[in-house]
Amino acid sequence: MSKDFLLEIGLEEMPAQYVTSSVLQLEKRVTDWLTENKIEFGEIKTYSTPRRLTVLVEGMAEEQANRVEEAKGPAKKIALDEEGNWSKAALGFAKSQKVDPADLTFRDIKGVEYIYIKKEVIGEKTSTLLPSLEKVVTSMTFPVSMHWGSNDLRYIRPIKWLIAMFDEEIIPFEITGVTTSNTSRGHRFLGKSATIKQPSDYPNALLEQFVVVNAEERKQAIVEQLRELESMENWQIKEDDDLLEEVTNLVEYPTVLSGNFEKEYLELPEEVLITTMKEHQRYFPVFSQAGELLPHFVTVRNGNHENLDTVARGNEKVLRARLSDADFFYQEDLKMTIDEAVAKLQNIVFHEKLGTLTEKMKRVQKVALMLADYLDWQEEDKQDIIRLTNIYKFDLVTNIVGEFPELQGLMGEKYALLQGEKPAIATAIREHYLPNSAEGELPQTDLGSLIAIADKLETLIGFFCVNIVPTGSADPFGLRRSAFGAMRIIQANGWNIPMLEVISRIVDMERAEGSTELPDADVKKEVQTFLKNRLRVILQGHHIRHDIIDAVIGGDPNVIPQLIDRAQILNEHAEAEWFRPTIEALSRVVKIAKKYEDGVEVDPALFENEYEQALFDKLEKLKFDYAGLTIIERLKAFADLRTTIDAYFDNTLVMSDNDELKNNRLALLFELASFIKEFAQMDEINVK
């Protein structure tokens, strides 16, 4: 037989951004508890609002199933005394397992006999186990938590009520003075207490008290009301999953309404208006069918349709004050020139160990010009780099960015255009912050891409130089994001920038600037390792086999686009019939070539057979062609070498007793191995 179980944690209003993750955590912890306690169950449903986290477990068994358990005890030589009687160790084991010593048996495990017992365990009633769920509730962790009253428990918000019901039976436990019951609380203003007769009644009982406990139903209700308003007003309300998720978790009983603001505010930059509405007020902006922003907004009320006009006027008043402030900030910003803004950057500390923003911009300028040289950019392009890196952070001192930090770069672009900067420079000011997430949009212009790479690499290496590095999950300065973003941009542009050399030169630059606390060699090695680990993440995102990732990163990790191409091509051909014998042959070359001693050059006059000459000829052709070959052509060239390599090893004793012959043969293999290892560490690839 089975019953349903309901667990509700009633709380003061939680931050909306943590509601969904918290209820999913509760679901997992309850699922794990049921599994650990060997209680069978059916479907688990989750419900959540800003004031409650709930799981409803359907079909929970009324008792654990009876089961047979085995337990291993001490070895036989310890379990029996000299007279063959049970020792204290054996008797203690039997007592701990609650079995009669007569039930003990022996079992051979890898040549050693141990005591074993088999015992039938009678399942306990579920209702006697459920009170221990109190530990599940109190063990939850949250990004933010608090104490309240005299309690030691830290929780996302104070617990106000608890429900724990196994069908009609209330499961008793208590947390911070709150005892479980079958009574929930309805909407804070519209509802009353709700008595739950049995778990399956829970959603409807709360709905009667103006609480939609199913988050997906609340979200769908909001979407339907938005679409209805769109149709009625001939508006366009653009989909915004993040905002929709947030407002869903801000309300218990959603009602959509609209409001208006003065048309003159449309003269503000659209981004300022939208950010004011979305980020500060959680309003949906309204557009015409042509995509133009309109002087209206849509919001979601936590309540019913009563007095919507009054609610709308209240929201309009709040937004009007926000927009008035934004307009003032914008007008003040327009009075300031870019040069005046740049002058203020020397008073803003980037980091206490890395100087001011002005000093950082100068370092980034050097890095950007270095990268431009590697890419053979023209003098005109370099002049754009100089102008850009002299000003690209200027909007950080503007009033709008001070009020709306998320508009950094965007406002820089707008202000730069208004003050007559080149469009390419203005665009790069915005793009240098990209990507702003793991899968975020990349810069679309060359100048924006270059400055984004330079800024991110200088940030990354600068912090490493002063021994500030990510540890575990802690990365307060976003260095993983900087590294990942820089490599994504390099890959997307296909720029063959020699990363190891660039890292070395930036570290030397930081040393010259006086902003380094560690030996240069240590910093260079740590940054290289850090970037290699970020490369692993990128390659894993391309679904590359782990052994192939190890192989290409163990090869030449210097040029990122080529490395990624090598990994993808090896991965694509890993199942080809020729792949295994080719990798085996190349790996054999690399392995034996490790015995080569420096200083010996290949002398064809010492060849004793045609197979040495054939391999030498193939190697000479490879040397001549290699630089002009594509990645796939290089792999095919290695594959074409396979039969020649096999024939060479079948007919040539590399480790000859004659040192001159041996060293000559090792020199030949070493030259070939240098090409192979640049492509990948072939012996890392699993072909078995």
UniProtKB/Swiss-Prot annotation:
**The keyword ATP-binding appears for this protein:** yes
Disulfide topology: none
GO biological process entries: glycyl-tRNA aminoacylation
User: Which InterPro entries does this chain map to?
Assistant: Gly-tRNA-synth_bsu, Gly-tRNA-synth_heterodimer
| Broad class of enzyme this protein falls into | ligase
Query: Keywords for this entry?
Result: Aminoacyl-tRNA synthetase, ATP-binding, Cytoplasm, Ligase, Nucleotide-binding, Protein biosynthesis
A Gene Ontology molecular-function term?
A: glycine-tRNA ligase activity
PANTHER family for this protein: GLYCINE--TRNA LIGASE, CHLOROPLASTIC_MITOCHONDRIAL 2 (PTHR30075:SF2), GLYCYL-TRNA SYNTHETASE (PTHR30075)
Q: Which family does it belong to?
A: Belongs to the class-II aminoacyl-tRNA synthetase family.
Q: How does it assemble?
A: Tetramer of two alpha and two beta subunits.
Q: What is this protein called?
A: Glycine--tRNA ligase beta subunit
